[in-house]
Amino acid sequence: MSDLHELCGFQTRPIGPKYIEDLKFYLKNGIPATYTIEEAYNYTNNIEEEPTTTTTPLHIICSHIPNDASNDEIDIINQMVEILLEYGAGWCLTDINDDTPGCILIRRKLNNTPIYNQVVAAGVRAELLLRKVSEYDMEIIEDTDDLNHEQFEGIQGEETTEEERKEEEPSNTSDIIDEQKVEQPKEDLKEDPSSNQETYLKTKLEYKDGALVTKDRKDGVMMSWETDLMRMGCDSLFKGASIDGEIDDEVNILNIGFGMGIIDTMINNKNPTKQYICEAHPDVLAKLRLDGWYEKQNVVILEGRWQEQLNKLLSEGNVFFNGIYYDTYSEHYEDMLELFDIVVGILKPHGVFSFFNGLGADRQVVYEVYKQLVEMDLANYGLICKFEQIEVPESTLQLEVQNSTDNKSVWDDIKRAYWTCPTYYHPEARFMDV
C-alpha cells in the first residue's frame, strides 16, 4: 500500500486541512487518482500480471469515512473526493468485492451525503463526455500505463512547498476508461443476445411460467414480477387521453415491445380508439397471432423494428399518440436517444411518454446516474420527465431463498438477475408547456 492509499484510510484523526495538502501533493507529483492497491501490491511483490480488481483511493475513502465524523471532517473528506474526481478518479471502477465507490457508500447508508452526490454527478459527466469522445472516435490513453512506481516511493507529503501547492490543470479522462473496463470484449458482445439486437432477433425464445427467456441461454427477456410496474406505465399513458378534463375524441396508444403482453393487455382493457403494438421478434409475433391479437378490431400490429416502423408513421403524419410506452430487449441508451427524436414527432401535445426504467438497474449508483441523464436528455427534446419512486417487491431482490422448500427465487432458472435496486423510478414525460 502506498502513502496515498494510507492517507485515504484516515488513520490519523481529526481529519483536517493537512489531508487535503498531502493529497494534492501526491497527485501533482504524478500519482494517478486511479492508482490502485492492487498495482502497488504487484509492484512491491514483483508480480507482472495485470490486476483484475481496482481498489482506488476513492474506494478507500468511501470505506473509511468514520461513522462518528464531525461536520468539519465530512467537509474535508468531501473536498478530497472532489479533488480526486477532478484528477480523474474512476467513479465506476470495482474493487475486490465488485463494489464501486458509490456501492460502498450505499452499503454504509451514506448515499444521502454530498460525497455520494459527487459520485453520481461524476457518473453523469463521464457519460456525457464519453458520448462526445465517441462522436470523434478519439483514442483514450489509460493514465496508469507505464507507471514509474519507484518515483512514487520517493514522494513524501511533508516535503510540499508553497509553489507545489499551486493549482494545476487536472485530467478528466479516466472516467471514460472506467466505462471501457466494464465492457465485455466486442466479439462476446456480438454473440450475446442481451447486448446485440441482431443476435437477439435470431435467437429462439421460450414462454415459461412467469417469464419470457432466450431458449438456450435463459436470459430473462421479461418477467411477471414487472406487472405492477407495467400497471403504472399503463395508467401514465392514459393520463394523455384527456385535455382539460375532457376525453380526447381519438385515443391512440403505442407500445414498443410486446414481450409477455402484460401492459398491452392492460391497455386493451381500457379500450382505446387504436392500440398500436410494435414488435420485431418472430417468436413474439407468433405469440401475438396465436393469442388473437391480430383479430382485435382496435389493434394495429407493426411488424419489425421500431427504427423502421415508427419512421414510416412519422413520414406519413397521419397518426399521433396520446401515450407511448417503450420496453424493448437488447437495446441500449443510445437507442433511446434515437427514439426520443421520433417520440416528439408522433406524441400529441398533451400526450405522455413512459418506458420501463431498467437503465443500470443491476447497480443502484448507475441507476441514479441514468435517472439524471434521462431528465437532461428529455429536456433537450422539450420534454419534462417526472419520476415516481416506489419500492421494488422484496422477492425481486432475493437472488436465493434460504432455508425454504416451498418458496423459490423469481430468478431461479434465469441466467442473470437484471434487477437488484430496491427502488424503481417510474418515468412520466410530457411536453414542457403542458
UniProtKB/Swiss-Prot annotation:
Source species, domain of life: Eukaryota
Classification via PROSITE patterns: SAM_RMT2 (PS51559)
EC number(s) given by UniProt: 2.1.1.-
Principal cellular location given in the protein's record: cytoplasm
Keywords: Cytoplasm, Methyltransferase, Nucleus, S-adenosyl-L-methionine, Transferase
Location(s) in or outside the cell: Cytoplasm; Nucleus
One MF term in the entry's GO annotations: protein arginine N5-methyltransferase activity
Basic and acidic residues: compositionally biased ranges: 178-193
Positions of the RMT2 domain: 193-434
A GO BP annotation: methylation
Residues the entry annotates as binding S-adenosyl-L-methionine: Y200, M230, F258, G259, M260, G261, I262, I263, E279, A280, H281, W306, Q307, D327
Region (Disordered): 155-198
Database matches in SUPFAM superfamilies: S-adenosyl-L-methionine-dependent methyltransferases
Family matches, as InterPro entries: Arginine_N-MeTrfase_2 (IPR017408), RMT2/GAMT_Mtase (IPR051038), RMT2_dom (IPR026480), SAM-dependent_MTases_sf (IPR029063)
GO cellular component assignments: cytoplasm; nucleus
Record-stated family: Belongs to the class I-like SAM-binding methyltransferase superfamily. RMT2 methyltransferase family.
Function (record text): S-adenosyl-L-methionine-dependent protein-arginine N-methyltransferase that methylates the delta-nitrogen atom of arginine residues to form N5-methylarginine (type IV) in target proteins. Monomethylates ribosomal protein L12.
Subunit structure: Monomer.
Name of the protein: Protein arginine N-methyltransferase 2
Organism: Debaryomyces hansenii (strain ATCC 36239 / CBS 767 / BCRC 21394 / JCM 1990 / NBRC 0083 / IGC 2968) (Yeast)
Phylogenetic lineage: Eukaryota, Fungi, Dikarya, Ascomycota, Saccharomycotina
